[in-house]
C-alpha cells in the first residue's frame, strides 16, 4: 500500500490524541464531553481547528469567548493564547491541524 492509514477514537469520553506528528503537519483529534476543557496554552504553530460535532467555546487572548458549531474551520495564528472548552450538552469533537508541525516551526 502506498497510503499510510491511521485510526482515531470514536468514544463518548474525553479523548485527546495525536494522530500525525511530522515536520510538515501535526494532526490531533479531540472529544470533549460537556464541562471538559483543554489546559490554557499558547498555539505552538499555525492552528486550524475543525469542529466535527457539537459546539466549541473558544477564548483567544483577551477576546470574549466565542461559540462555533460543527462545520467550522477556525484559523488561529501562532503564539495565540487559547482556551478551548465544551460548555454545551452535545459531545464536542474536533480535529486540530498544526502547520508546520510544532517541532519544525521557526527552523
Question: What would you call each of these model-derived segments?
Answer:
Residues 1-24, 106-107:
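A short, N-terminal "cap"/entry segment at the start of jelly-roll beta-barrel domains
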Residues 63-78:
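Short acidic-glycine-tyrosine-enriched beta hairpin
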Residues 17-19, 30, 37-43, 60, ...:
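Short histidine-centered beta-strand/loop micro-motifs
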Residues 24, 63, 89-90:
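Short strand-connecting beta-turns/loops that link adjacent beta-strands
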Residues 31-33, 43-57, 97:
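Short, conserved beta-strand element in jelly-roll/cupin
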Residues 14, 27, 46:
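Short coil/loop residues immediately preceding or within conserved phosphate-binding loops
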Residues 78-102:
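Ligand-binding loop in jelly-roll beta-barrel domains
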Amino acid at each position: 500500500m502506498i497510503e499510510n492509514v491511521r485510526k482515531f477514537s470514536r468514544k463518548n469520553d474525553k479523548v485527546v490524541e495525536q494522530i500525525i506528528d511530522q515536520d510538515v503537519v501535526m494532526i490531533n483529534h479531540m472529544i470533549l464531553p460537556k464541562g471538559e476543557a483543554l489546559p490554557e496554552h499558547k498555539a505552538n504553530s499555525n492552528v486550524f481547528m475543525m469542529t466535527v460535532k457539537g459546539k466549541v467555546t473558544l477564548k483567544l487572548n483577551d477576546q470574549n469567548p466565542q461559540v462555533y458549531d460543527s462545520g467550522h474551520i477556525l484559523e488561529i495564528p501562532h503564539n495565540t493564547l487559547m482556551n478551548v472548552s465544551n460548555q454545551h450538552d452535545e459531545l464536542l469533537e474536533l480535529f486540530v491541524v498544526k502547520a508546520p508541525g510544532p517541532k519544525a516551526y521557526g527552523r
